[in-house]
Structure formats: C-alpha cells, structure tokens
Amino acid sequence: MSKVRKPDDFAAFWDDVERQASAIALEPEVVPDPLRTSDDVETFQVFYTSLEHIRIAAWYCRPVRRAERTPAIMLLPGYQMDPPIPKEWARKGYIALSVAPRGKLRSNRQFNPGYPNLLTHNIVDRHTYAYRGFYVDTWRGIDFLLSRPEVEPTRIGVTGSSQGGGLTITTAAMRRQVRAAAAGAPYLCGFMDAVGLTHTYPYEEINDYMRLHPESRHDVETTVAYFDGINFADRIACPIIVNIGLQDNVCPPETGYTLFERIGARDKQLYPYDGHGHDAGRVRHTAIVDRFFARHLLDRDGNA
C-alpha cells in the first residue's frame, strides 16, 4: 500500500507557482554552435529565464533538411548526468531540446547545491524546496519550444529516464501541449515509499537527512507530497509509455506500478523488464520508444 497522498491544496500550490513563473519573461536566446554543427544537424546553445530569474541552458539541435514546421522532442536529464547534445534525435527527424535545469552544467552559476544535496536542499519548506524551481525549469523548456516558429506546436514529445523519467511525468502533467511522453525508471515518484524500500542513493539522501534531523520527518513528508510525480499523474492526458526494471534498487518497481495506476491518460502502456535493474531494459526498450514517437509525432506506422 502506497503512502503517497495528494495534499488538499496541491492544485492551488502549483497554480500559484505557475502564476509567479508566468510573470517572468522567457527571454530566449539561441546561439549558433558551429563547432558542434554538422552537415546534417544544426546545433545551438539555448538560454531562457525561469523561476527566480535563473537563466537555464539547453542544447538545441535541428535537422538541416526539415519541413517548415517540424515535430520536437524535449529530453530531460538524470540526477547526476549533464544533458547530452541531442544530435541523434535530430537525425531521426525531430527538433530536439536537451535541458539543463538549475544546478546542472551551464545552469549552475546562480544555484548549485551539488550532488548529493539537490534532493534535500530546503526539503522542509515546499516554497523554497530545490525541485520547485527545477520542475519549472523543465516546463519552461516546453514554453521555449512553443516560441520557435520552426517547431510544429501540436507535435511535441518529452522523454527521459530516472530523474528524467520523473520530470517527464511532471512535464506531461503540467503542459497540455505535450502530445506524447516516454518515461523510463521514473524517479521522484513515491518519495516516501522509496526511502523505505531502498537504501540506495539518491533516495538515501532523505534517510540521511532524517537520521541527522529526526524532528524533521513530518515536514519532509509534507513537502515531498507536493513534488511527488504520483500526485501529478492524474493530470496526464497524452499517450504515454513507462518502462521499469523489476530488480531496480534505485527506483523500486513498486513505485513505478503505483505511478502507472494513477496516470490519467487512457492511452498508456507499462513495460516491466524482468532481470533488469535501474537500466529498466533500456537497450531492449529503445526501439519501442522510437516507434512510439514516430507514430505520435511523425505519423509513421509502428506499434508501441
């Protein structure tokens, strides 16, 4: 039985955060990167402004040969990884945005809690918790794509694994313009369930924090409920696929099953991979993700 419960003021809290963010101009900047541009893919460094006026960096790739308006994919990073340059997605026919939320490389001048520490930074106060701005940084990535004349606004997808999988869930929930989503081994889903099921980092950061500050447990539980992907899941309306590893000791599969049950979309599919840990069957699953996005964003036949 999951411990995840949605706070009564969950919607009001995030509506207020969105109001604060919408009052801040996006101020997008797109800088050509000739060093990383090739014959078939144009590469740019992108910057835009997010909550608390923090500048967020991203890599932006687009096919040299493309339609006037092209489908787009936003890629979201894992907890300890920095965003890759998404040229392989551009070669598949998409415009691709690889976002570096606050604290990641090139987005860490104004906010840099480090790793480990992001997960517990201000964890006793939902109004200042690190993931409050971190989530908005990713949602503003969709806003950036919608601002680009070369992007087809009705064909935007989002994907990521681990932390990127959790961010895929929250982004699909909070940006209705997302047409399709693929979340792998989703982290940030079932926080308090996970800390009881695993003693592997990053979730172990929360156990460490509560051992040092035992009086904080109630405040920690209260805060993370507002950021738990499971509490966002019923807002998801777009087609979505989720893959989990049944031997995952980083993001326990129990949390993946709970998440999937709560997803509101009618078009949803869960892929559980036995014999796999936190990789969540990535090698086997990549072709499924490719077919899924090709069907929903490129109108190409394929089954996912």
Question: How should these model regions be labeled?
Answer:
Residues 1-42, 301-304:
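N-terminal targeting or regulatory segments adjacent to alpha/beta-hydrolase or S9 domains
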Residues 58-62, 68-79:
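Short beta-strand element of the alpha/beta-hydrolase
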Residues 84-136, 193-194, 200:
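Cap/lid segment of the alpha/beta-hydrolase catalytic domain
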Residues 119-162:
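Gly/Ser-rich "nucleophile elbow"/oxyanion-hole loop immediately N-terminal to the catalytic nucleophile
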Residues 169-215, 272:
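Hydrolase active-site cap/lid region
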Residues 236, 242-244, 248:
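Short beta-strand/loop motif that positions the catalytic acidic residue
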Residues 246-251, 279:
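Acidic catalytic loop of the alpha/beta-hydrolase fold
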